[in-house]
């Protein structure tokens, strides 16, 4: 599966229990994928999404959190549309929902950026805002020289608000205008991995980092004849990258980690350039690649939750340090 739909599919199934986070996610989706329309003097809200799972998630949250019913309209491919589009429309109570989600202020005037309660909210609200923005208009390219995670924004105010949310997550993002369209872009590979983890896309980040490592290893092999010591250290970076987050996870959990998860993590650390299928073959007893990926994902998720409870850096925080150590070593 291509990276963008893989990420959207995973985070659209992510369970979120905190009400503030669910509100922030809905607000971001409506801001980045939605529009306000006046019909007979009343506000009608529409949000157009490219995945049915995201649309159903939005429809459910609008009802459960804000108490408004909505209709889901499926638009078949046609014209410039390559795939189906899914429109969530709120007619009855649209004006009230617009105020509840911060699309308009108390006087009914449009708010151009993200609502104040999201901008000044907790870290989890910043994560939820990014999750909603990515579901609305996000994309992730394959690892490579021009790899990037991007979100198309409805205007410069929304773009700057999203950059601010990334800053609260210690992630460097830039707002830029390309041919009249505002975008927020994250280009650094480590930052992309950290942001995907924040969004809750643990399976996708494992796949992305593995593809990233394999690309670096292949590029290294093609230039081996001309390598000097500096280039060899660069290839060591790829070897360290695969096990960096797993190593941090084992450090956070210590003796609390279940043995079957620890075993999968140790395999990842000991065989950094092996594929998930190869790791499964090395396990005793052998495992499928999906089983290995699932165990590593649960290990990282368990460690990140433990780190959050303790108020210490999570698994993604060590990645840059580990890579730096790999380069020096």
Curated annotation (Swiss-Prot):
Q: Which residues bind DNA?
A: 275-308
Question: Which GO molecular function terms does the record list?
Answer: DNA binding
Q: Which InterPro entries match?
A: Homing_endonucl, Sporu_reg_WhiA_N_dom, Sporulation_regulator_WhiA, Sporulation_regulator_WhiA_C, WhiA_LAGLIDADG_dom
Coiled coil regions, renumbered to chain = none
Gene3D superfamilies for the chain: Homing endonucleases
> What processes in GO biological process is this protein linked to?
cell division; regulation of sporulation
Q: Which UniProt keywords apply?
A: Cell cycle, Cell division, DNA-binding
What Pfam families does the annotation carry?
HTH_WhiA, LAGLIDADG_WhiA, WhiA_N
Protein's job: Involved in cell division and chromosome segregation.
* UniProt record similarity statement: Belongs to the WhiA family.
Recorded protein name is Probable cell division protein WhiA
Biological source species? Streptomyces griseus subsp. griseus (strain JCM 4626 / CBS 651.72 / NBRC 13350 / KCC S-0626 / ISP 5235)
């Amino acid at each position: 599966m291509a990276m963008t739909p893989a990420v959207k599919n995973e985070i659209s199934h992510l369970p979120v229990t905190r009400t503030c986070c669910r509100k922030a996610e809905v607000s971001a989706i409506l801001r980045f994928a939605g529009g306000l329309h006046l019909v007979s003097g009343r506000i009608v809200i529409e949000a157009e999404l490219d995945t049915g799972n995201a649309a159903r998630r939005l429809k459910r949250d609008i009802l459960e959190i804000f108490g408004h019913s909505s209709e889901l309209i499926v638009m078949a491919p046609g014209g410039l549309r390559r795939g189906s589009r899914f429109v969530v429309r709120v007619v009855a109570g649209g004006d009230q929902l617009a105020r509840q989600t911060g699309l308009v202020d108390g006087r009914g005037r449009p708010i151009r950026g993200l609502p104040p309660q999201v901008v000044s909210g907790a870290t989890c609200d910043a994560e939820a805002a990014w999750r909603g923005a990515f579901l609305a208009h996000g994309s992730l390219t394959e690892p490579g020289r021009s790899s990037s995670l991007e979100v198309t924004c409805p205007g410069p105010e929304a773009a700057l608000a999203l950059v601010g949310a990334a800053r609260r997550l210690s992630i460097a993002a830039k707002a830029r205008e390309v041919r009249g369209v505002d975008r927020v872009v994250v280009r650094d590979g480590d930052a992309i991995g950290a942001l995907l983890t924040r969004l809750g896309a643990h399976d996708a980040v494992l796949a992305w980092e593995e593809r990233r490592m394999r690309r670096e290893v292949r590029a290294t092999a093609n230039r081996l004849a001309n390598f000097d010591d500096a280039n060899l250290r660069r290839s060591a970076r790829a070897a360290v990258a695969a096990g960096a987050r797993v190593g941090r996870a084992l450090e956070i959990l210590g003796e609390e980690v279940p043995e079957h998860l620890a075993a999968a993590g140790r395999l990842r650390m000991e065989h950094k350039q092996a594929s998930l299928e190869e790791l499964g073959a090395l396990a005793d007893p052998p495992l499928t690649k999906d089983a290995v990926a699932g165990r590593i994902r649960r290990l990282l998720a368990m460690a990140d939750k433990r780190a959050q409870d303790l108020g210490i850096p999570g698994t993604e925080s060590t990645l840059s340090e580990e890579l730096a150590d790999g380069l020096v070593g």
